[in-house]
């Protein structure tokens, strides 16, 4: 969510003519992230987020925006795309597709506890089940084919030890993806990027018996149809780790995974390949962070993430992965 494309006051005024959102009160760029240009937008009607899509095309975008509308209609708290005056969910700004969505309440919890992981686990399972009847289909664009295409461009910049790990894990994942067990894993629309900074929490209402309340999931622009277990693995690799070492926090991981299973129990194939999928989740972000670090795009406000973080996580997952926790009952 960096700003690659600047938007002037006159640009914004022209753009807002296509919306019935009142007068603009405030507008500012969001500096975090590395994929799209995002801006907080406040009008007399409410708070919104304007996104200019730097890589996604007009042909790809309906999958993401319609998915958000679908999930919202099924009770999953996500940003709701705002239609333009012609009914479309996006238009063109500076020659690139752009959209406005509602801004969720709450703030990110960057030091989550067990209670936050429980909320995230339950809602992630609800998201997966809610997407079962979503009519559009688009693969996760940062999966195996993307890794195979981009790893060769990264290799010249890294050490021999890193190259051995990068190429060895790619071969391992290619074999896993080609297996019958992989084909049997449950799949559907996935967030694919459910990090701590893509989830908001608000204060729980008095008398509810809860300390935290999930405000919602956002930044769906890496979403795609993938194995649900991959989505769980990506989430656990961020929400349930020691940030300094990449080691799993067993208490948080256990809480998130048990909460997920109260909504959707894991299959036998998922249990067998939990280690493989945790490795896949770590590998995906190590590759993308290496690529963004060594082959960056120019941007006004760009803060590339440390690729070493997911290298440490990948090495940890190869060395140590506890089994998925068992539960006795499940409810819907």
UniProtKB/Swiss-Prot annotation:
What Gene3D superfamilies does the database record attribute to this sequence? Answer: 3.90.1200.10, Phosphorylase Kinase, domain 1 (3.30.200.20)
**Organism's domain of life?**
Bacteria
Which terms are listed as keywords in the entry? Amino-acid biosynthesis, ATP-binding, Kinase, Nucleotide-binding, Threonine biosynthesis, Transferase
User: Does Amino-acid biosynthesis appear among the keywords?
Assistant: yes
Tell me which EC number(s) this protein carries.
2.7.1.39
Reactions it catalyzes: L-homoserine + ATP = O-phospho-L-homoserine + ADP + H(+)
Q: In which pathway does it act?
A: Amino-acid biosynthesis; L-threonine biosynthesis; L-threonine from L-aspartate: step 4/5
List the cysteine pairs that form cystine. none
Give the first-level EC class, as a single word: transferase
Pfam families in the record, alphabetically? APH (PF01636)
Set out the biological process GO terms recorded for this chain's protein: threonine biosynthetic process
Q: Which InterPro entries match?
A: Aminoglycoside_PTrfase (IPR002575), Homoserine_kinase_II (IPR005280), Kinase-like_dom_sf (IPR011009), Pseudomonas-type_ThrB (IPR050249)
Asked if the Swiss-Prot or TrEMBL record annotates the protein with the keyword Transferase, the reply is: yes
Q: GO terms for molecular function, please?
A: ATP binding; homoserine kinase activity
- Family as reported in the entry's similarity comment: Belongs to the pseudomonas-type ThrB family.
User: Which NCBIfam families does its entry note?
Assistant: PRK05231.1 (NF003558), thrB_alt (TIGR00938)
- From the Swiss-Prot or TrEMBL record, give the protein name: Homoserine kinase
Q: What gene makes this protein?
A: thrB
